[in-house]
Amino acid sequence: MGWQRLGAAALQVIDRYVDDGVIMSFSRHISRRRKPDVDTLIRGVCAGQRSHLAMAITLVESRAPKHRRLAHELMQRILPHTGGALRVGLTGVPGAGKSTFIEALGMSLCAQGKKVAVLAVDPSSSIHGGSILGDKTRMEDLARHANAFIRPSPSGNSLGGVTARTREALLLCEAAGYDVVLVETVGVGQSETEVRTMTDFFLLLQIAGAGDELQGIKKGVIELADAIVVNKADGDNQRKAELAKVEYSRILNFLHSFTPGWQPQALSCSALEGDGIDHVWALVLKFRDEMTASGVFERRRREQNVDWFHALLQQAVMQRFTESNRERIQALEDAVGRGEVPVSMALSELLP
C-alpha cells in the first residue's frame, strides 16, 4: 500500500503499537507525502490519536514561515478544546531519578484510567541528542502504554523558544484528551523558571546526601516548588532520605511560598519500588482542590496566558528589529568586537 493510501485504520495501528519517538520521525516522513491539512490534524488530535498529535506538535515546532501560518490556525481552532488537564512541572538534580519517578507516577495514573502526557524540556540539548532522549529510552514501559504520550521538546538556543513551543505542545496534549501533562526539565539553567510559568504545580525531586540543599536555595529553585520529594528512599538509603525530608521541611517553613495560600511540603518516596508515589499524587490533588476553591488556580492560569503573550511579543519585536537592521547590527557588532566603539554607544546608535 502506498503512503498516500494509508488510511485511518493503519494510523490507529501505528498509534497503538509504535513508540511516539518513532511516530515523530514517521510523521515527518508522511508529512512530505500526505501533507495532512489543519482540518485533518484537528480531527485526529481531538480523537486522541497520538500519530496526529505528534504531527501537530511537529508543525507548531517548525520555524518555517509557511508552517507558522498553519500553526497559528491550528492553535486558534484547537483552543476551545484546551484547559482540562492538570499541568505538573517537575525538575531535579542530576541523578535524582526523574525518569524513574515519571514512569512510576505515569504508570500509576494510567492504571487509574488517566491519560498522561510527558513533555521533556532541556535548553542545553536539541531534539536529536542529549539527556532528553536518554531519559525517554529509560521510560520504555510508559512510552508503550496506550494511555501515555512522551515527547521531547527541542529548544534551540532560546529559552523563550522553549516556552513558546512547550506551551503549544501542552495545549495540544490537552486537546487530545490527556488528563495530566507532566513537563520535565533537567534541573540546570533557567528552564525551571520557564516551566514554572506554564504549570499549575511545580515539584522538585531531590536525593539525600547530594549536598544540594544550600545550592538549591542559591539557584532559587526551592522557592519555586510547591513540593519537594526526596527520591530513592529505599534500602540502606531510606534513613538518610527520611532525614533529608525533615531538613527540607524545615527549610520550606522559612521560605516564602510561590503559591499564595499554600504551604509547600516535603515528602519521600522510592520510585524504583513504587513506594510513596500515591502520597505524592494525593498532595498534588489536594493542591488543585484547595487552589481551585480559593480562586488561585484560575487566576494563575490567566496570569500565565498574559505572561506568555508578553514573552512572545518581546520575542517577535526583537526578531523583526534584528531582521530589518541586520547589516547595521553586523557593522556595529564588528566595531564593538574590534574595540572601536563602546557597547553603550553602539546601542545608542541602534536605539536613539
Question: Over which residues does each language-model region extend?
Answer:
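Hydrophobic positions on the alpha1 helix immediately C-terminal to the Walker A/P-loop
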Residues: 101
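Nucleotide-state-sensitive switch-loop elements of NTP-binding domains
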Residues: 37-85, 96, 105-191, 198-205, ...
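P-loop (Walker A) phosphate-binding loop of NTP-binding proteins
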Residues: 93
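Hydrophobic anchor at the beta1->P-loop junction of P-loop NTPases
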Residues: 88-90
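Canonical P-loop GTPase G-domain recognition
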Residues: 234-288
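Long, well-ordered amphipathic alpha-helical subdomains in the mid-to-C-terminal portions
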Residues: 53-55, 268, 279-352
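Non-catalytic terminal/linker segments enriched in charged/polar, low-complexity residues
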Residues: 3-80, 330-331, 347-352
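Conserved C-terminal guanine-recognition region of P-loop GTPase G domains, centered on the G4
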Residues: 189-197, 210-258
